[in-house]
Every structure is written in structure tokens, then in C-alpha cells.
């Protein structure tokens, strides 16, 4: 009986929430309740008819003012009921598929969402359009606000400015049962959708790890806004596990590989003309220096201002033939050239000229190799576009292009990449340096939480007892072994200031310093005499 009461209360509270958020109407209560029962494989309990027939209007307050509503917890109650009813797998992904199915049923259909969005865009209010759409995606649980709030964030002062650090705890850990099922699955058919960025994900029910094609998340509550970039249809959505404010994604309607070229730059410029309050950028289109998904052409953007955008200006340059474009070398660990112009066409042409020149540029004195004997190309760029005013604030009439020069050459000494995080930093970061990290925001793995916690305990023990064998303790601890050399160095430099209250903050600061070194590893022109001379040779060629 208690379970039945919990289901009724959870369903009715969720419906009240959906009405409050204008996802459904007051007269939808009975339909919505029965739809939730269907989703969880139930035929009861009966709803409260006094509640169902309420006629008073709920005040449409700001989305964050509905007191104490726990969307994640409410969906968990309903998902548990679905598991008990045999309507969902007893796994984390099984529960999530039910939760997304419920929220998808309570959301407006894509055509309604598009009409509402375009109505706001039609009166030249792109900020109002994205505010409304972002609010809907949060309210519907597609943007996982509760999960994102669990991320650990801080900033670290460095020679490059304040770098932003995030330990990403928002993405769910893989359930061991899902992992086992994936190992036993047979993938015999065509994979649909081809990847998680395809626009065909809109409304997709998801599938388990044991299913043909393997695990795929449920996307019933995903809504994708059709937009036009360079005359093609693209999709616009928000990221479910956002790394920064209003983290959005634009993805090609065609499942095709990433490419950084004139067409891609045109798409980026079209995007900021649609949404001048957002920046937009593309991962590089080569392995090692690209993102985790190279198979689907897409961009990432949002409302955040990254550390790179506040980097100190070092010197100015011009690009021959483009007198309306000003170029700036930024003091940034990666090699970034910034272009500015009121003239969109000139900025596009100048940026394309730099990209084409860089793709063919070889300077063996600094290890840059454009092509190897096997014909493989190694040079590309990570481009970022935004519009600013004369003070650098987002949304103005000046176009800005940031071009981070990248090279994915490998050597025997650096088999994962010469301009990739070096081995001595892999205990903190060994993954590719993609678009977000290029701009100065580290996305670090959740393993660091227990590992840094264990390192903290050993450092405090060594501080308390001069006879404590710190080196042996670190090497003998599975959580700390990879950090041993780094932790010993931190202790040698900072033991005097170390306390129980500040130990984790000190470790966080030192992690930020390592991230700065990692970005420096990724820079093709180092900040030494040889690197400065090499960069100037490239700029002079323009």
C-alpha cells in the first residue's frame, strides 16, 4: 500500500510540476496520470479526483521558484515502481530510460517547441528564444541540473591567467550489469541512430547494453531546433551534461565526419549571426588533437566566457590582402591567433588563408610536421567564433575568430602525440585536449576524487609524523601510486602551509598547475626563444 501511495503522490507531484512549467495544461491531469501509469507498467493506483478536477490556476513563477521539488528523486520513485512491475531493467540505464520516457510524454511535441522558439526568433529576440528553450530543456530533465551540480569546480591562478577546473561527476557511472550485458551482446544489424549526435535521437527510446547495437541512452525528452547553416539543415540542442553555462550543440543533419575548412567556418559565422550572444567552436578534425567524436560533424557553444578569451595580447599582425582584419598573438599555452573584423567576408577569407597555410606548414626545428611519408596530414586548427562589441562583451558587431594551431604528429618518445599531454601528467589528464580545454576549462575524470582524497591523507600523515615514509606509503596505495612523484613534490614545496582544512585546496591548486602544463604540452610554438621565432616565421608567411 505504501508503494502505491508513493506512486500516486510522485505522479501527481510530477504532473503539478509539468503544469507549473507550462509543459502541459491544467486539463491534462487525468491523461498525464494515466500516461505515467502506462510508462511504469501499472494499472493503478487510482488518482485523487479532487486533485484531478482542480480548476484554480497555478502561478507561473520563475522556473527556479517552485519550492523544494525534487525532479530527480520523483522520477526515481516512478522508475523503481517500473522495475518492480517488470516494465524496466533493474539497472541504472533501465531506470533512466523509464524516467526519460515519462518526461518525454509530458513535453510539448517537437513541432510545438519549434513554433514557440521560432516565434521568439521571428521578432528578433534570439536571447529570449534561447532562454525559453534552455529553460524547457532543464525543466524536462534533459539538461541534468541536479547531476551537473555535483561537479567539483575551482579556478587556479597561473601564468596564463585563471584556469578553470572541473572534476566531472555528472555523467553516470557505468552499471556493472550493463557492462556485462554489453560484453555478451551480438551486434548484427545496422546501428540506429548512428551516434549520439544524430538528429534521429530526438524521441529515441534508448536501448540496453544487451540489445543489438549495444547501449544507447533514451532521448524521449530531447528536442532539436532545426536551423540553417551555410544553406544546410542542422540541429540545435543543449548538452545534457553541460560543462559550462548554456552548453549547446549544433550538429549536421547528415552523419558525416568532422571537417575544419571554409564551409565549417561559414557555418560557425552563420551560427553567431543567428545567436550573437553565444560563442561557437569546432573540435579539430584529426585524431589526438580532436574531440572524442570525430565521426559526426558538430559544433559546441554557449554563453560562457573562457579564460582564453581574456588572454593578454602579446603582439599584432596582419594578413596580406585583408586590411579590414586585425590579428593578435595571445599569451596562451596553446598557439592561438585571434582575428577581429567588422567585415565578416574578410574575416572568413583571412581565417581560411591561415588554416590552409597551417595545413602545409612544416618547421622541424620545433617538431611541426605537416605531412609524413605515408601521406598522412598532421596539421589542423581548433576554431572558435564569437561576436563582441568594442569592449569585448558578447553580442556586438565585431566578429572574432580564435584559431588554435594544432599538430598530431607522434614520435617514439611521445607515441600518443608530441603536442598531447605528456606522460608525466597522465595521472591528472591523459585524454585529448579538445575544444573546451583549448579555451582553458579542464574536464577531469571522477577517479580524481578518491585519489586526491587518499593523497591528502598521506600528506597529512607525513606532516604529523616526521618518521612517516611518504614515498613508500604513496607507492603502496593503489589510489595514489600514479600520483606518487607529483605528491612528493607538492609536499616538499608546501608542507609548511599544509593543514587538514586546506590540504584538498592545495591539491586542487596543484592540479590546476598541472593542467597549465598539459595545455603547454599541446602548444606547437612554445614560449621560449625557439618557439617565439618559429611562430614569427609562420606569421611572416601570411
Describe each region flagged by the PLM.
Residues 1-211, 402-405, 409-542:
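Sequence termini and other peripheral, non-core segments
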Residues 157-159, 293, 395-397:
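Solvent-exposed loop and beta-edge segments used for protein-protein assembly and interaction
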Residues 170, 285-287:
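Active-site beta-loop-alpha junctions enriched in small/polar residues
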Residues 175-177, 245-248, 289-293, 349, ...:
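Short, solvent-exposed polar/charged micro-motifs at secondary-structure junctions
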Residues 245-252, 290-308:
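Histidine-centered divalent-metal-coordination microenvironment in nucleic-acid enzymes
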Residues 302-323:
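Helical (often loop-to-helix) elements that flank the catalytic cores of nucleotide-handling enzymes
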Amino acid at each position: 500500500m505504501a508503494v502505491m501511495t508513493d506512486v500516486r503522490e510522485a505522479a501527481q507531484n510530477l504532473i503539478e510540476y509539468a503544469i507549473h512549467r507550462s509543459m502541459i495544461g491544467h486539463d491534462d491531469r487525468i491523461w498525464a496520470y494515466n500516461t505515467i501509469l502506462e510508462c511504469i507498467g501499472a494499472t493503478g493506483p487510482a488518482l485523487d479526483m479532487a486533485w484531478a478536477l482542480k480548476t484554480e490556476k497555478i502561478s507561473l513563477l520563475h522556473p527556479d521558484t517552485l519550492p523544494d521539488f525534487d525532479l530527480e528523486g520523483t522520477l526515481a520513485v516512478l522508475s523503481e515502481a517500473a522495475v518492480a512491475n517488470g516494465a524496466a531493467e533493474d539497472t541504472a540505464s533501465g531506470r533512466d530510460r523509464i524516467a526519460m520516457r515519462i518526461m518525454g510524454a509530458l513535453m510539448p511535441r517537437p513541432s510545438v517547441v519549434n513554433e514557440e522558439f521560432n516565434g521568439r526568433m521571428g521578432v528578433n529576440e534570439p536571447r529570449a528564444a534561447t532562454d525559453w528553450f534552455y529553460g524547457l530543456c532543464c525543466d524536462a530533465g534533459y539538461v541534468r541540473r541536479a547531476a551537473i551540480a555535483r561537479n567539483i569546480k575551482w579556478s587556479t591562478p597561473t601564468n596564463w591567467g585563471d584556469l578553470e577546473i572541473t572534476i566531472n561527476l555528472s555523467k553516470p557511472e557505468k552499471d556493472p550489469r550493463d557492462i556485462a550485458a554489453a560484453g555478451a551482446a551480438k551486434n548484427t544489424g545496422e546501428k540506429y541512430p548512428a551516434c549520439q549526435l544524430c538528429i534521429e535521437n530526438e524521441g529515441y527510446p534508448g536501448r540496453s547494453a544487451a540489445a543489438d547495437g549495444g547501449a544507447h541512452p533514451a532521448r524521449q525528452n530531447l528536442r532539436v531546433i532545426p536551423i540553417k547553416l551555410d544553406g544546410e539543415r542542422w540541429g540545435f540542442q543543449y548538452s545534457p551534461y553541460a560543462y559550462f553555462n548554456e552548453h549547446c550543440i549544433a550538429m549536421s543533419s547528415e552523419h558525416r565526419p568532422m571537417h575544419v575548412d571554409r564551409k565549417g567556418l561559414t557555418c560557425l559565422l552563420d551560427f553567431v549571426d543567428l545567436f550573437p550572444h553565444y560563442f561557437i567552436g569546432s573540435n579539430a578534425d584529426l585524431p589526438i588533437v580532436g574531440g572524442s567524436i570525430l565521426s559526426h560533424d558538430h559544433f559546441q557553444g554557449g554563453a560562457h566566457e573562457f579564460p582564453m578569451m581574456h588572454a593578454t595580447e602579446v603582439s599584432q599582425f596582419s594578413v596580406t590582402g585583408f586590411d579590414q582584419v586585425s590579428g593578435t598573438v595571445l599569451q596562451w599555452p596553446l598557439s592561438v591567433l585571434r582575428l577581429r573584423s567588422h567585415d565578416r567576408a574578410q574575416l572568413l577569407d583571412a581565417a581560411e588563408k591561415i588554416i590552409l597555410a597551417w595545413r602545409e606548414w612544416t618547421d622541424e626545428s620545433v617538431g611541426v610536421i605537416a605531412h609524413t611519408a605515408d601521406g598522412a596530414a598532421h596539421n589542423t586548427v581548433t576554431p572558435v567564433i564569437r561576436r563582441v562589441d568594442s569592449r569585448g562583451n558578447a553580442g556586438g558587431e565585431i566578429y572574432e575568430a580564435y584559431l588554435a594551431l594544432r599538430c598530431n604528429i607522434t614520435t617514439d618518445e611521445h607515441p600518443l602525440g608530441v603536442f598531447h599531454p605528456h606522460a608525466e601528467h597522465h595521472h591528472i589528464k591523459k585524454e585529448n585536449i579538445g575544444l573546451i580545454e583549448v579555451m582553458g576549462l579542464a574536464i577531469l575524470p571522477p577517479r580524481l576524487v578518491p585519489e586526491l582524497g587518499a593523497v591528502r591523507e598521506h600528506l597529512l600523515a607525513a606532516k604529523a609524523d616526521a618518521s612517516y615514509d611518504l614515498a613508500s606509503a604513496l607507492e603502496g596505495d593503489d589510489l595514489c601510486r600514479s600520483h606518487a612523484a607529483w605528491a612528493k613534490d607538492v609536499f616538499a614545496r608546501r608542507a609548511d602551509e599544509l593543514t587538514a582544512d586546506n590540504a584538498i585546496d592545495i591539491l586542487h591548486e596543484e592540479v590546476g598547475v598541472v593542467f597549465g602544463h598539459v595545455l603547454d604540452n599541446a602548444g606547437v610554438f612554445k614560449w621560449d626563444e625557439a618557439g617565439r621565432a618559429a611562430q614569427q616565421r609562420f606569421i611572416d608567411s601570411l
